[in-house]
Regions:
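Histidine- and aromatic-enriched segments that form or immediately flank copper-ligand environments
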Residues: 1-57, 107-109
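A short beta-strand/turn structural motif
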Residues: 48-61, 86-93
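Structural beta-strand segments of beta-rich domains
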Residues: 131-133
Length: 135
């Protein structure tokens, strides 16, 4: 679900030309966790380049029960061409975006919170027995 409703999800208000500044105000009517992304065309290319994130709208009065731990998890998908082979025979670490793979929604990599092993090896979600946890 998107954070903003209406034509283009607020794109007309939030789209700025190079060198231009815009300010938009939105009344957040529905509490919840939402995805936001830029609205510049072509949207799949911008999303593939990381122009998205999460927006948490708390209920009025913050009437959610208190918890010991709270975690936010965002899935990312990366659509790229096969890596080129460098002169030394190793695969390049730089890959090129694949528009066809993006249109087909066939990711070559799926990551959480922006990187491989982000929620396991590098930054595991931790809690103690008996903790109340919100994910």
């Amino acid at each position: 679900c998107h954070a903003f409703t209406g034509p283009g999800g607020g794109a007309a208000v939030t789209t700025a030309e190079e060198g231009e500044t815009k300010v938009g105000r939105f009344k957040l009517l529905y509490p919840g966790l939402y995805v936001y992304h830029c609205a510049a065309a072509p949207v799949p290319v911008h999303i593939a380049n990381g122009m998205y994130g999460l927006m948490y709208v708390q209920p009025e009065g913050n009437d959610l029960p208190p918890v010991d731990k709270e975690y936010y998890v965002m899935q990312s998908e990366f659509y790229h061409e096969p890596p080129e082979v460098d002169d030394d025979g190793r695969r390049s670490e730089i890959v090129e975006f694949s528009y066809p793979n993006g249109l087909r929604e066939e990711p070559q990599v799926v990551a959480f919170n922006g990187s491989e092993s982000a929620l396991t090896r590098d930054h595991p979600l931790k809690a103690h027995v008996g903790d109340d946890v919100r994910i």
